């Protein structure tokens, strides 16, 4: 994949996406499948296409993505972050527009760990007065 490919790494929750973009006709391949086959939800497809539509490059690039970890929403967010970074690698003048839309910043929210003595991260056992 060396040559005229631009690269970006995206992360969201526990998902990590490695994104490669090059000039093409708009094909997006995720883990060897077309994007419509890989992501079942329409919202996930919208999330992934956000940086491309914002910069008017929806049909300009062929994109290959390798994504591991997490669930569908986390993977979609990781792919979006990776595409954003790859676009900045391709053309640094796109960064202000992408930053203004909040796509450059990594969403740092992670699942909070379960605490000892509680049922979940913050949910305590039911209190019985008698």
Swiss-Prot record:
Single Gene Ontology BP annotation: translation
SUPFAM superfamilies on file: Ribosomal protein S5 domain 2-like
UniProt keyword Nuclease present: no
Gene Ontology terms for molecular function: RNA binding; structural constituent of ribosome
InterPro entries linked to this entry: Ribosomal_Su5_D2-typ_SF, Ribosomal_uS9, Ribosomal_uS9_bac/plastid, Ribosomal_uS9_CS, Ribsml_uS5_D2-typ_fold_subgr
Keyword terms: Ribonucleoprotein, Ribosomal protein
PROSITE patterns: RIBOSOMAL_S9
Pfam families according to UniProt: Ribosomal_S9
A single cellular component GO annotation: cytosolic small ribosomal subunit
Gene3D superfamilies membership: 3.30.230.10
UniProt entry tagged with the keyword Signal: no
Family: Belongs to the universal ribosomal protein uS9 family.
Protein name: Small ribosomal subunit protein uS9
Natural source organism: Ralstonia pickettii (strain 12J)
